[in-house]
Curated annotation (Swiss-Prot):
InterPro entries: Bact_exopeptidase_dim_dom, Peptidase_M20, Peptidase_M20_dimer, Peptidase_M20A. Keywords: Glycoprotein, Hydrolase, Metal-binding, Protease, Secreted, Signal, Zinc. This is Probable carboxypeptidase PADG_04062. It comes from Paracoccidioides brasiliensis (strain Pb18). Zn(2+) 1 binds at residues 160, 193. The active site is at 192 (proton acceptor). Binds 2 Zn(2+) ions per subunit. SUPFAM superfamilies: Bacterial exopeptidase dimerisation domain, Zn-dependent exopeptidases. Its main location: secreted. Gene3D superfamilies: 3.30.70.360, Zn peptidases (3.40.630.10). Its EC number is 3.4.17.-. One of its GO terms (biological process) is proteolysis. It is found in: Secreted. Belongs to the peptidase M20A family.
């Protein structure tokens, strides 16, 4: 009786669903779940899932290659070959190493377009550099019942922004397969994470014509699959203080640079929280308040020495106004706190600060969001001043910015695959729109 009861029980045992031939943790025989599968088998199943998908395998290939800013050459070469093998004409745009780096390796932007279409009307663009350190690519099955869409891909760049790079390429290939005459271009740039010299290089090149030959730009960054209607502006600030060194036992013989800079930094820290009328930085309904982040503070030589120097670097995310207006507010605040001391110096080292950037969101089928982070978008100067219809700029991509740059950077298979659909919608809208009239490009 006991044996019969056991057989009857097993015959009605509920079994977790199996998706795409894979199952997490358990081996399935008939309708009976037996012992957990070993890690080797699970790893093989996950690797097969990736290998069977052109999107996932491309994403894995480029994420496995370290491409920290100023060391993007290796991943660039892989993408060059990948695109050429699939019929694109591909050009290198050599970009010099950023100032202050020791890198001598070649690195470059990638400019790709279908054969016979050197001036595509629609450009998909993202960046191939990442922040340090490189974190190894890895695959992780979901807890509980297996769901293919919930498989998690971890590692540096899996979100920011190689997810966008892979999804944009696959979306472009799918469109060109159905219609080889679609005027699609791909631009993948270097150094987005450290100042944007890659996009600046493209912007200053002969490819950025006046007026532009393109009518649509689709930028790829982690946006949680939302279409972004704008992002905050950016301004960098450095403040330096000079003191006089002395023995800490006789501090009146010197002057502390740290003591001079501290009240100024306290004032800077609150500029985003107080009204413009009382000396604060502006806010807006769309972007909220301007935020001030004191990122680094340096000063002094030892605890028994009155510090001779002190400095701080600050990032300001502008919610309203112009960088020039923000600079004036900051100078005034520093002057008020320091009493106009000549021992305090304020500098704005970014050669290309920018105000809040408004973007296009006129394509149906997307949730809309606003983001606080910066992008390459303001680094590309678009010469459409004389055009009746301006160039469209869209910002969209898979993954969340909340894990980008962190130790837990990662994305799900489902989000990566949905991004291909999202980019396809944006491409379709751009193809349908086209130029309202012919534009002569010099």
């Amino acid at each position: 009786m006991k044996l019969q009861y056991l057989v009857a029980l097993l015959s009605v045992q509920a079994v977790p669903p199996v998706t795409a031939g894979y199952i997490h943790q358990y081996a399935l025989v008939g309708s009976v779940i037996r012992q957990p599968i070993d890690q080797k088998t699970q790893r093989e199943n996950l690797n097969k899932l990736v290998s069977d998908s052109p999107l996932l395998s491309l994403h894995r290939t480029i994420c496995e290659i370290e491409s920290v800013s100023n060391r993007e050459g290796a991943v660039g070469e892989v993408l060059l070959k990948y695109l050429r093998d699939r019929g694109f004409t591909v050009e290198k745009q050599i970009v010099p190493a950023d100032r202050g780096t020791n890198s001598t390796a070649e690195r470059f932007n990638i400019w790709a377009y279908p054969k016979g279409c050197p001036r595509p009307k629609i450009i998909l663009t993202s960046h191939i550099d990442t922040v340090p350190p490189h974190i190894k690519y890895s695959l992780h099955a979901p807890d509980g019942d297996f769901d293919r869409a919930k498989v998690r891909i971890m590692g540096r760049g899996t979100v920011d922004a190689k997810a966008s790079v892979a999804a944009q390429i696959i979306a472009a290939l799918k469109h060109l397969k159905s219609n080889k005459d679609i005027p699609l271009g791909l631009l993948f740039v270097v150094s987005e994470e450290v100042g944007g010299s890659g996009m600046v290089h493209f912007s200053n090149s002969e490819l950025n014509t006046n007026p532009p030959f393109f009518h649509t730009l689709i930028f790829g960054e982690p946006t949680d699959l939302t279409l972004v209607d704008g992002h905050k502006g950016n301004l960098r600030v450095t403040i330096e203080a000079k003191g006089v060194a002395a023995h800490s036992g006789y501090p009146w013989l010197g002057r502390s640079a740290i003591s001079e800079i501290l009240p100024i930094l306290a004032r800077m820290d609150e500029l985003g929280d107080i009204p413009v009328e009382t000396g604060g930085l502006p806010s807006s309904e769309k972007y909220g308040r301007t935020t001030v982040n004191i990122g680094t503070i340096k000063g002094g030589a030892a605890d028994n020495v009155v510090p001779e120097t002190a400095s701080a670097s600050i990032a300001v995310r502008l919610a309203a106004g112009t960088p020039e207006e923000a600079e004036e507010i900051i100078r005034r605040a520093v002057h008020d706190v320091s009493g106009g001391s000549t021992n305090i110096t304020v500098n704005f080292p970014d050669s290309m600060p920018y105000p809040p950037i408004d973007l296009d969101v006129d394509v149906e089928g997307f949730d809309i969001s606003t983001v606080n982070y910066g992008t390459d978008i303001p680094k590309l100067e678009i010469h459409d001043e004389e055009l009746e219809v301006k160039v469209k700029r869209y910002l969209y991509g898979p993954g969340t910015i909340f894990v980008a740059h962190g130790a837990e950077e990662g994305i799900t298979v489902g989000d990566l695959e949905k991004a291909v659909e999202g980019y396809s919608k944006l491409i379709d809208a751009a193809v349908k729109r086209g130029w309202p009239r012919e534009v002569v490009v010099n």
